[in-house]
Swiss-Prot record:
EC numbers, comma separated: 3.1.-.-
Source species: Nitrosospira multiformis (strain ATCC 25196 / NCIMB 11849 / C 71)
Top enzyme category: hydrolase
Name of the gene: ybeY
Name by which UniProt lists this protein: Endoribonuclease YbeY
Cofactor: binding details: Binds 1 zinc ion.
Length: 189
């Protein structure tokens, strides 16, 4: 088996030299009372690093449906809980409610990723997906949004989907879009 020298999130420079791995400062918060298993901090970190192409400071929060609904309503004007939300902070602007608080370091990417446990669990069941595989997919999806990926246009959606699929395969997970379109598999806007 070929040794993996870097994550698939790392841009390919075309050179043989091993790319320098992205530095990550990450805070994880569990704010849900779900009875289903939640990904460990180590798994979340592994998934984030696999998708990361730049040094980053990220707060990842797993929430209940009430908080997920409130955040989606307040920040996106969508009156329902969604599976993943990504908040990117530029030019040192951090939302006052961010788990990062005022402790922003010298990282070029700073942001929050919020996963709504009940929505993730429900989707995994409806789509007959392994729960941890679905958490991995949505974590990677959020990290790609943090780095500027989006899926508003068809070509952008295709690029994001291919990148997610490649990263998840590298992590040992199946194609999350097999049998689905992006809008069906990931409902983040």
């Amino acid at each position: 088996m070929k040794e993996r020298s870097s994550s698939p999130g790392t841009p390919d420079s075309g050179r043989r030299a091993r790319p320098k791995p992205a530095k990550l400062k990450m805070t994880v918060q569990y704010a849900t009372s779900t009875r289903e298993p939640l990904p460990s901090r180590a798994l979340l970190r592994k998934w984030v690093k696999a998708a990361l192409a730049h040094d980053a400071e990220i707060a990842l929060r797993i929430v209940d449906e009430e908080e997920g609904h409130r955040l989606n309503r307040d920040f996106r004007n969508k009156d329902y809980a969604t599976n993943v939300l990504t908040f990117v902070y530029r030019d040192g602007q951090i939302h006052p409610d961010s788990p990062l608080g005022e402790k922003r370091g010298a990282y070029p990417l700073t942001g929050d990723i919020v996963l709504c446990a009940p929505v993730v669990e429900n989707e995994a069941g409806q789509q007959q997906k392994d729960l941890m595989a679905h958490y991995a997919h949505l974590t990677v999806h959020g990290v790609l949004h943090l780095q500027g990926y989006d899926h508003q246009e068809d070509e952008d959606a295709k690029n994001m989907e291919e990148t997610e699929t490649r990263i998840l395969a590298w992590l040992g997970y199946e194609d999350p879009y097999a049998g689905y379109q992006l809008a069906e598999a990931v409902d983040c806007g």
